[in-house]
Regions:
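Generic hydrophobic transmembrane alpha-helix motif, especially the helices
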Residues: 36, 40, 70, 80-81, ...
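Non-cytoplasmic
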Residues: 104-108, 116-121, 125, 129, ...
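Transmembrane alpha-helices
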Residues: 55-71, 160-192, 239
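Glycine-rich helix-loop "coupling/hinge" segments at transmembrane-helix boundaries
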Residues: 98, 109-112, 139-140, 189-231
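Short helix-to-coil transition segments within interhelical loops
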Residues: 39-44, 81-82, 141, 151-170, ...
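Transmembrane alpha-helix signature in integral membrane proteins
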Residues: 46-81, 235
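N-terminal signal-anchor/first transmembrane alpha helix
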Residues: 1-21, 93, 171
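C-terminal transmembrane helix and the adjacent membrane-cytosol boundary/short C-terminal tail
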Residues: 127, 173-181, 222-271
Length: 271
């Protein structure tokens, strides 16, 4: 399901029957053989805009997820392994950021720095980092007590090398789960920001923007709103389902017993 939506987003611009910005039909025109999803509020082909409106959303969501995972994992591993004052500083910072809902935190950064696309990606990515850091810290606290970590320390391995070579490889499972969850959240948040006007400037096609632009004509041509909304829903649900399936298969088949126990310790809400 999610793969089908991804396929639509990737090859959509190639197979689009019209330019996404061309005025080719009537305002909120009903679906027809020539325009299967009708027209939007300016008379542009809804199908063409749907086909062109997903690729940048996916790219931005993937980039934001990568930022959140990298920053969050680095913070979580450092806090758990180094402990002491550094652990306190990192986790108190995490607690402060987590006091704000993700969308509010992203909006705060964008209102201060401006709604540029790279800033949207950065803001959403940083909003993911605290939750990732908390999960990875919990997992690292357990791994840091394992024998192979203690052996590396006795051999004189530097802390940075211990974290990179001994701890990080054993966090693959929780990182995979977090990446899937954060990708789902990234899609929803970025689409929501586009709906609120923080996205590609008009007349660029974007699924979130399309919902906002065409909601005034919902009774005239509901497909102008339904089509992008359904694609966003299918993508998020499919991504979440796929992540859950991968986590269960990975824990049950390929991972060592200690990794399975580690993810179980994280709780059902993280698995």
């Amino acid at each position: 399901m999610a793969l089908l939506v991804v396929l639509v987003a990737v090859i959509g611009p190639v197979v689009s029957p019209h330019s996404p910005n061309a005025l080719v039909t009537l305002t909120f025109a009903k679906p027809s053989s020539q325009f299967p999803l009708g027209g939007d509020f300016l008379g542009r082909d809804v199908l063409s805009r749907v086909l062109n409106g997903g690729w940048l959303l996916l790219l931005m969501a993937a980039a934001a997820t990568a930022i959140g995972i990298v920053v969050g994992a680095a913070a979580g591993i450092s806090a758990a392994y180094l402990r002491g004052a550094r652990d306190g500083i990192i986790m108190r910072t995490v607690d402060v950021i987590l006091a704000f809902p993700q969308l509010v935190f992203a909006l705060l950064l964008l209102s201060l720095l401006g709604p540029k696309l790279w800033l949207i990606v950065l803001a959403v990515g940083l909003s993911h980092a605290p939750a990732v850091a908390r999960v990875i810290r919990s997992a690292t606290l357990d791994i840091a007590e394992r024998d192979y970590v203690k052996v590396a320390e006795l051999q004189g391995m530097r802390p940075a090398k211990v974290m990179a070579k001994e701890i990080l490889p054993n966090l693959v499972t929780p990182l995979m789960v977090e990446a899937g969850l954060r990708l789902t959240y990234s899609i929803v948040i970025i689409a929501g920001l586009a709906f609120l006007g923080f996205g590609q400037p008009p007349p660029a096609a974007n699924w979130g923007t399309m919902i906002n632009e065409n909601r005034i004509g919902l009774q005239l041509n509901p497909w102008a709103v339904i089509a992008p909304a359904v694609l966003i829903a299918l993508l998020t649900i499919g991504t979440n389902t796929f992540t859950d399936a991968v986590a269960r298969v990975t824990i049950g088949v390929d991972r060592r017993p200690e990794e399975a126990a580690l993810l179980d310790d994280l709780g059902p809400e993280q698995a």
